[in-house]
Amino acid sequence: MKHLIFSSALVCALVVCTFAEEQVNVPFLPDERAVKCIGWQETCNGNLPCCNECVMCECNIMGQNCRCNHPKATNECESRRR
């Protein structure tokens, strides 16, 4: 009986942790969007090729996928990336 209760508690904890992990999705704040060159180097660490042409780039938590919100018009951000 103890094993059944322990197993049930473990499964419930795992489900709660998995659900909480999926809810972590913090978008850019409105005041961050107004600042040039923010987002892609801080959110994506400037190391992802898919963010090279972006002023603001959002990544997933693993840093494998990104979405360019505002393409660069010039190379004004290039020096900040280094």
Swiss-Prot record:
Residues 21-33, 80-82 form a propeptide. One of its GO terms (cellular component) is extracellular region. It is found in: Secreted. The keyword Membrane does not apply. Expressed by the venom gland. Belongs to the neurotoxin 02 (plectoxin) family. 02 (plectoxin) subfamily. This is U1-plectoxin-Pt1a.
